Structure formats: structure tokens, C-alpha cells
Curated annotation (Swiss-Prot):
GO terms for biological process: cytoplasmic translation. One of its GO terms (molecular function) is structural constituent of ribosome. Belongs to the universal ribosomal protein uL22 family. The lineage of its organism: Eukaryota, Metazoa, Ecdysozoa, Arthropoda, Hexapoda. Keywords: Ribonucleoprotein, Ribosomal protein. Residues 177-186 have a biased composition (Basic and acidic residues). It comes from Drosophila pseudoobscura pseudoobscura (Fruit fly). Residues 161-186 are annotated as: Disordered. SUPFAM superfamilies: Ribosomal protein L22. This is Large ribosomal subunit protein uL22.
Length: 186
């Protein structure tokens, strides 16, 4: 069992999943993970499926050099976005794994929220490409480690409503004006 960078507040109401050394681009996966952070589990799964079908885009905020603009990014209050299909598929598989862990623990999957998701760089894999004049250049891949913690959302209890709202304190000047209005109307 690997270590997680963070432990959840309530261990009995949360579940974890991780994927080490995934052969998927780190930068794309980081942006996709930031998009689903703090989403309910069902919404995150719908979002990732929509990204695969190019119905919704992933906003690129940090690693956005050379990323084109798209109209779908407006809903995220940004201009740049892409549809990283492979990253979305890997994260969707990880969320399915975490959901299965939640079912095993007896938690309600419909009330789960993506509490923590983190993407770290893994060790680069080295290949080579052949260039002109007998030279060789590196052809590196940038895999990543991903970890997810889902937490069951607590029921929010609303405050009791008072019958009379607290009266606003009025200044002497305003009280004087109100008295004058009352006298004029009579």
C-alpha cells in the first residue's frame, strides 16, 4: 500500500484510489484533475465522459502555453481549453476504482465528492529519435502519479428562521425625518 500526500479528515466516510506511473501526459492530466476537484462524483464522471466526446472542454490555466482558444472554456471563465481524451479516460478509470472502494466500505456513491486529487510527475521514460547527419536526440515521455480521495458529503443543517428579523438601528437624523413624514401625512 502506497502513501498518500494527504489523509482525509474522516477516514470512515472517505475512500482512496491511486495510479502510479501512468503513461499519460503530466500537464494534460494536471489540468483535467484541477477541473474535477471539489465536484460531486457523478458530475465528475459525466464531465470526463463529455470531455471524451468533446462536449465540454478542460480549461487550461497553468500549462497553457500555445493552447488554442475555444468557446466552451467560457463557462470556466477562461479562454483556453482542450479535450485531453487519454487523461480523461485514465481519470475516469481511477474514479471508477475509488467508487468501487466506496461500495466495498458501504458508503453511498451518490453523496461522494472529489475531496482531494493530486497529480505528480513520475520518472521520465527515455527513447531516441534519429536526426540528420548521424545525430540522435532524446524522445522523452512524461508519465505521472495520480491519487484521489473521495469523501461523503455531510448533510447541511439550516438555521432556525426567526419570526421577526432584527430591527435596524436608526440614527437620530433618520428618526427625526420619519417623525416629520408621519406629521405631514396626517
Amino acid at each position: 500500500m502506497g502513501r498518500y500526500s494527504r489523509e482525509s479528515d474522516n477516514v470512515t466516510k472517505s475512500c482512496k484510489a491511486r495510479g502510479p506511473n501512468l503513461r499519460v501526459h503530466f500537464k494534460n492530466t494536471h489540468e483535467t484533475a484541477q477541473a474535477i476537484k471539489r465536484m460531486p462524483l457523478r458530475r465528475a464522471q459525466r464531465f470526463l465522459k463529455a470531455v471524451i466526446d468533446q462536449k465540454e472542454c478542460v480549461p487550461f490555466r497553468r500549462f497553457n502555453g500555445g493552447v488554442g482558444r475555444c468557446a466552451q472554456a467560457k463557462q470556466w471563465k477562461t479562454t483556453q481549453g482542450r479535450w485531453p481524451k487519454k487523461s480523461a479516460e485514465f481519470l475516469l478509470q481511477l474514479l471508477r476504482n475509488a467508487e468501487a472502494n466506496a461500495d466495498c466500505k458501504g458508503l453511498d456513491a451518490d453523496r461522494m465528492v472529489v475531496h482531494h486529487i493530486q497529480v505528480n510527475r513520475a520518472q521520465c521514460l527515455r527513447r531516441r529519435t534519429y536526426r540528420a547527419h548521424g545525430r540522435i536526440n532524446p524522445y522523452m515521455s512524461s508519465p505521472c502519479h495520480v491519487e484521489v480521495i473521495l469523501t461523503e458529503k455531510e448533510e447541511v443543517v439550516s438555521k432556525a428562521v426567526d419570526d421577526e428579523p432584527a430591527k435596524k438601528k436608526l440614527s437620530k437624523k433618520k428618526l427625526q425625518r420619519q417623525k416629520e413624514k408621519m406629521l405631514r401625512s396626517e
